[in-house]
Each structure stands twice: as structure tokens, then as C-alpha cells.
A protein has these predicted regions:
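Small-residue-biased structural context
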Residues: 1-142
Length: 142
């Protein structure tokens, strides 16, 4: 799951960069990405958020990073709320602007975690998380 976690971070960053640029250039093209963005937010990104919230963030809390964890959780919640707004947007709503907002927050969030929060975990912390992930995935497999 940890390898997937970082892969999803990279995918989110790449997608956000592409969508932000697309929203600046063509509202129609950005709006055409609505369904694929929602599928990404509700699939891979939601799994990513849940994994962080249940596995990574408790370890960060142990390192005294509670305030930073709360910022990341607020960003997760904001992205979930934007996904809801995007899903319920009406034809007269500015879908391209919503997509731009999602992209901007995804970029900010992935940079916040990748550049500031994740480096606070030691090599040993990551090893422990990997072991726990393997054990928990082994229990979940029939």
C-alpha cells in the first residue's frame, strides 16, 4: 500500500498540474474532464486519504506533528467537499472553475505532504509502516 500511496501522490500531482493548465486555456476542455476527475477523487484519492488518516497520520501524531496532521485532514475534507460540489454542479455552474479549485488544492496538498510532512518520519518509521501494511494486507487476503 505504501508504494501505491506514493504512486497516487504522483498521479494526483500530474493530474492537478494538467487540469489547472487546461482550466486556464479552455473551459470546455476542463469541463470535459469532470467525470474522470470525480472517478479519481472518489476512487484512488479516497483510498489514499483513508490510508493516510488511519496509518500515516497516527505515526506523524506520535512525532508531535498533530497541528500539521490537522491541516492535512482539513485539506482532505476540503477536497471531498469540492468533489461533492463538482458532482452536483448544474449546467449553469462554472465547472471549469471548480476543476481549477480542485487542481489547485490537490497540488497544494501533495506538496504539503511530500515536502513537509512525510520527511518527518524516520527510515525506521517507514519500515514499521511497511511491515504493518504487509501484515494487514495478508490478513485481508482470503
Amino acid at each position: 500500500m505504501l508504494a501505491e500511496l506514493f504512486g497516487e501522490e504522483d498521479r494526483a500531482r500530474d493530474m492537478a498540474t494538467r487540469l489547472a493548465e487546461l482550466a486556464r486555456k479552455s473551459r470546455e476542455s476542463a469541463s470535459a474532464e469532470r467525470k474522470s476527475l470525480l472517478a479519481f477523487l472518489r476512487g484512488p484519492m479516497e483510498r489514499h486519504f483513508v490510508f493516510e488518516e488511519t496509518r500515516i497520520f497516527p505515526a506523524l501524531d506520535e512525532h508531535g506533528l498533530g497541528p500539521e496532521v490537522q491541516v492535512a485532514i482539513k485539506q482532505h475534507d476540503a477536497l471531498r467537499q469540492l468533489a461533492e460540489k463538482l458532482d452536483s454542479a448544474m449546467p449553469e455552474d462554472d465547472v471549469a472553475q471548480l476543476i481549477f479549485e480542485v487542481a489547485r488544492l490537490m497540488l497544494h496538498h501533495t506538496n504539503f505532504e511530500g515536502d513537509y510532512i512525510y520527511p518527518e518520519l524516520t527510515h525506521e518509521d517507514w519500515r514499521r509502516l511497511m511491515k504493518e501494511t504487509v501484515v494487514s494486507e495478508g490478513k485481508a487476503t482470503p
